[in-house]
């Protein structure tokens, strides 16, 4: 340590010596070059790889500045007023009550009848959702009415089902049984009822496979086990239950049901409006320049912002799932919040407006892909290419699913490489347009024509234009200018008809 202090104290004297300065320069160059070589040799990269191997990465780096990122949307709050469905398995399906309630409705497909159970009677009327003699809970009325209307009437266009029975005991809770083997005047209503249920659930195969054994206690609670096998169901059991996160639910099934009437008819639609979003800071003040998803709208904590370029693409191209989802967010933020409607009016407003907000062809296309076991979109997770230097994003694309799980990044490598290339092209095009806007047109013209002039002169210089005549075998006649007869006007060259030739200047 003392040697270092002594060296620092004598540093001014050392620098005075030229040889010492040269040694210092060489030492610095060697150290810097050694560090560069050490970084390029791969030892540091190997150590980083071994430390991070097997751990989750925040993003997949495509190149030095582009990163593959994703955003996972939380659509549940958007449809607080609508029941949201999910499936635990092929036989147990659930509906969550609106506005964050802790109760729900359980739908179970089984081959075991409850007709022998006490206090079961035929439902008086299913017209307009009238189940007053069945609904003894006093809390599931709105959800159950919506379920019956959408599941039964809007799909089947009938007002009764002769095989429907319910429990009428006071305080015993909700218990409704559909006998799916009994036909109505319209034919196999029960089978169509199951198909309608499959539309809401989102998996057309789930409603047709398996069977369950029921175990009912004296207090009216039924448990269903051994849900397996390959047979058609005979009964649909509807009962109230507590909401304990039985399964992860998605509102896209509800959207599919809301689009049911439009989905199977040839109806041309136009987008209701363009995006009017802007960025908001932490205090809620609007800052023009893009759109930020609030914390409730995404699965992970924080704010995710997309610039105006992404929103402009959504205004231009309507055939993208991400843009449809953003329209739903925009509608939820502005329409329902501004109008401050009650629950039932909000449901009606959403059902009427949803056909102008999202593309029903996309919903149907993804439903068909799911049915055909082709990777499909569930409108929840979207990937995009992020420029880590400029902060620009590509238009997010849906992260496809297969068999209930998201595809690996390698399955759509060509897609995100293409988006990365498009992002580079857009950046270069924008820089070119910016430069064009800052450069005067006259200066551009001068530069262009000067380049043309320079190229022409180079060509002429290479060709070599002859400038004067020479007498063959003699020196340069300048300053005399010889005619074609080898004569000069001044009389210096007097012998006519001598052989001449054209030569360049300086020859």
From Swiss-Prot:
Gene Ontology cellular-component annotations: host cell endoplasmic reticulum membrane; host cell Golgi membrane; host cell plasma membrane; membrane; viral envelope; virion membrane
Ranges facing Cytoplasmic side: 34-58, 467-507
Residues linked to a lipid group, N-myristoyl glycine type: 2
Marked site: Important for GP-C-mediated membrane fusion: 33
Segments passing through the bilayer: 18-33, 446-466
Chain positions carrying an annotated carbohydrate: 89, 111, 179, 240, 378, 386, 403, 408
UniProt entry tagged with the keyword Transmembrane helix: yes
Keywords of the record: Disulfide bond, Fusion of virus membrane with host endosomal membrane, Fusion of virus membrane with host membrane, Glycoprotein, Host cell membrane, Host endoplasmic reticulum, Host Golgi apparatus, Host membrane, Host-virus interaction, Lipoprotein, Membrane, Metal-binding, Myristate, Transmembrane, Transmembrane helix, Viral attachment to host cell, Viral envelope protein, Viral penetration into host cytoplasm, Virion, Virus endocytosis by host, Virus entry into host cell, Zinc
Assigned protein family: Belongs to the arenaviridae GPC protein family.
Stated name of the protein: Pre-glycoprotein polyprotein GP complex
